[in-house]
């Protein structure tokens, strides 16, 4: 599967609109700065490496994150209607978590986590459109990269 360039662009605008609408103050400013700084990588990233998994195509990451945000907001509304205690978190925190839930897939700040596979056999027979980038450690210290980039939020 793939999505056209217009949809990738529209998905990016939707993604940014979630930040604008649900995130406030300095946290919003920091997120917009970070995501705009990494826009080129993020808009083309896949959400997963294998065709059988979700969104393993260019533009898949932001498409996936947008759907996670929408799902989180819908679940929040359903939980509220069912009488669940939704006062233990804010909608801002919920959206913040949804926005950033897969950020480690970005890589380590120097290298991408997933790179296009050059192995035609694995692509054809296993559906592995991307491979894990061996230049970065599995479960690399992305936290430290992100922490320094998202200081204070």
Segments and roles (model prediction):
Residues 1-47:
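Non-catalytic interface/linker regions that flank or bridge core catalytic/transmembrane domains
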Residues 8, 19, 23, 43, ...:
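Extended aliphatic helical segments
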Residues 14-18, 71, 139-143:
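A general alpha-helix detector
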Residues 34-85:
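A glycine-rich, hydrophobic loop/mini-helix early in the fold
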Residues 54-57, 63, 75, 84-153:
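Divalent metal-dependent catalytic cores for phosphoryl transfer on phosphate-bearing substrates
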């Amino acid at each position: 599967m793939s999505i056209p360039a217009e949809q990738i662009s529209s998905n990016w605008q939707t993604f940014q609109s979630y930040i604008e609408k649900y995130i406030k103050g300095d946290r919003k400013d920091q997120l917009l700065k970070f995501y705009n700084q990494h826009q080129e990588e993020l808009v083309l990233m896949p959400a997963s490496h294998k065709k059988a998994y979700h969104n393993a195509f260019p533009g898949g990451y932001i498409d996936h994150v947008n759907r996670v945000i929408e799902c989180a907001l819908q679940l929040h509304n359903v939980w509220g209607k069912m009488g669940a205690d939704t006062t233990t978190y804010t909608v801002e925190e919920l959206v913040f978590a949804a926005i950033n839930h897969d950020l480690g897939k970005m890589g380590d700040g120097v290298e991408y986590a997933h790179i296009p596979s050059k192995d035609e056999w694995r692509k054809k027979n296993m559906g592995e459109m991307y491979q894990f980038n061996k230049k970065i450690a599995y479960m690399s210290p992305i936290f430290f990269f992100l922490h320094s980039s998202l200081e204070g939020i």
